[in-house]
């Protein structure tokens, strides 16, 4: 495996969710088309480089479809996968999410994680933030070894030592 790092695998397929009601227009109906991608890495440095590249890939995609100027990389809850994640949130009056935006820096955070600890981590002050309605159009997050350890997905380094693979989700 280590000679293949980074390895990225994706799928595009119909997804079905038992949503109580449709949300965010056609983006969160009960059936929708979704792309999932997972990356596998042998070092933190390799993972971080790939993660940053994927941020830029998504920004490029949103720009090409005409929503780049309205879409912000947003610090958010990681849900069941990680403590925090990055969402791509598009500003719209029809949005059901609330983000707080520092317009001077373009830094955004989801309302669900707005607290003093996060503000300090992002070097933001609450007074400089403006509230905006938005729709989540994508997210990426660091899985670390959450799944590789329980499934014993590992690689052997040049010293013949086994290590769990680092994973990302996009």
What are these regions (language model features)?
Residues 1-170:
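TRNA-recognition modules of translation machinery and tRNA-sensing kinases, especially anticodon-binding
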């Amino acid at each position: 495996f280590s000679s293949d790092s980074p390895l990225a695998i994706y799928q595009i397929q119909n997804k079905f969710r038992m949503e109580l009601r449709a949300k965010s227009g056609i983006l969160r109906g009960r059936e929708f088309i979704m792309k999932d991608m997972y990356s596998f890495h042998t070092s933190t440095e390799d993972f971080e480089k790939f993660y940053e590249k994927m941020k830029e890939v998504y920004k490029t995609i949103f720009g090409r479809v005409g929503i780049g100027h309205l879409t912000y990389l947003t610090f958010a809850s990681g849900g069941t996968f990680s403590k925090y994640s990055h969402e791509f949130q598009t500003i719209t009056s029809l949005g059901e999410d609330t983000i707080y935006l520092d317009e001077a820096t373009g830094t955004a955070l989801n309302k669900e994680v707005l607290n003093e600890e996060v503000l300090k981590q992002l070097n933001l002050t609450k007074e400089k933030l403006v509230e905006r309605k938005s729709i989540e159009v994508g997210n990426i997050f660091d899985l670390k070894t959450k799944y590789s350890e329980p499934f014993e997905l590992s690689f052997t380094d040049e010293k013949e030592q086994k290590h769990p693979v680092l994973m990302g989700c996009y």
